[in-house]
Amino acid sequence: MPLLRRRVHTERLIPQTTPARVVPVVPRQVQQPAERPRVIWRFSDGKAGHDSQSLGLVDALKRRTRIECYDIPVRPGAGLDWMLGRFPAGSLLPDPWLAIGAGHSTHLPLLSARRARGGKTAVLMSPDLPKSLFDLCVIPEHDRPGPAENILVTCGSLNRMQPVYETGSNRGLLMVGGPSRHYRWDNHRVAKQISRVIRYSPVRDWILTTSRRTPPGFAEHIRQMIFNRNLSLTVLSWRDTTDQWLALQLSRSCCTWVTEDSVSMIYEALTAGVPVGLLSLSPRRRDRIVNGVQALVASRNVMRFSDWSTGHPLPRPRRVFDEANRVASSICGEWGSE
């Protein structure tokens, strides 16, 4: 039998493969660590007007960068802490990027904190200590500070208010102060002006709020004076209001009237941008506070009761009062990269 030879085709012994599929390599995205919040130590003497200023600046800084704010009540012994280079009140807190204080009793604690833990210091209002000791002094123009690289002049004091756009409401706000070093308080004079404002203004719905300085019984006296079924008057003591109450009321008001002694409340209303009328008082003397209020009248940013009573409508502020945001922008621009 003949030997049959099979021809072996070697190409069939190699397994057939399909061309390799090329899968594009997507670079792995590396998640960037979140920016660490900047630490603020806010020193407080417990006075509402001073807290309003420092909180206003903290609020404005939070609108620009991540912030962790720690409130530190001031206590005696700050001078000794400064001399010894220590600051026990902040021993459990992270190092500050910025320390803020308003009020004379916060000045030495600010310096003690910086010496012990570093960071920058910002003092609000003119300090008793030399201004050169602080990294930043935020001083109202009515204090007439001299020019210096670490001084930022503002139009009035800082506060927590934000601009209010016209709401079309028919509600008015009355803010009453009390006896002060700068003005002679007169219960009868203020009550008479309030009565005429409520009776002759086109506004029908009113809220009146007092302050710590308002004489006892004054608000109740106003309530008894005003009796008109076509009017609504709500009287609230300052004890019955919260931190954000004033901002809410200003946002709902078409106008506000403030006693002339209440400079902080005047600037809060101006910052909100609502028309502001002044319930007039007699100044004790011509000092920086009185001159500052007179400058607001002369610039037609506010109107005294005597001018309004002749038929002139309350004007909206002629300029924008946005000082907390302006100071915050300056701080972030100067120290934001540190």
What do the PLM-derived regions correspond to, one by one?
Residues 36-40:
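Extreme N-terminal starter segment of soluble prokaryotic enzymes
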Residues 41-43, 157-217, 237-238:
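Active-site donor-nucleotide binding/catalytic segment of nucleotide-sugar enzymes
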Residues 42-156:
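Active-site and donor-binding regions of nucleotide-sugar-utilizing enzymes
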Residues 48-52, 79, 131, 145-146, ...:
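Short, charged/polar "capping" segments at the starts of alpha-helices
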Residues 199, 293-338:
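Leloir-type glycosyltransferase catalytic cores
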Residues 223, 227-264:
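Donor nucleotide-activated moiety binding/catalytic core segment of transferases
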Residues 247-287:
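A donor-sugar binding/catalytic signature common to diverse glycosyltransferases
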